[in-house]
Amino acid sequence: MLTPINQLLKNPNDIPDVPRATAEYLQVRFNYAYLEASGHIGLMRANGCSEAHILGFIQGLQYASNVIDEIELRKEQLRDDGED
């Protein structure tokens, strides 16, 4: 098993710091509205990507966006637990 994966499995609360500006930037880049407005979805269609492929891509980005949300939430929970 890859070392980073093993590390995360053994230490699920060892959450990296993600600067707010970085998180916000990635959230925008992973957003469907941005992808459509920037022409990325149209470019994928023009390059012959199937709708299933495009949907899978969008779902993958949504998953990545959810991971960023989870990082922020878990960091907040750990901070709150430390204040008790």
UniProtKB/Swiss-Prot annotation:
InterPro entries: Phage_T7-like_6.5 (IPR020121)
UniProt protein name: Protein 6.5
Organism expressing this protein natively: Escherichia phage T7
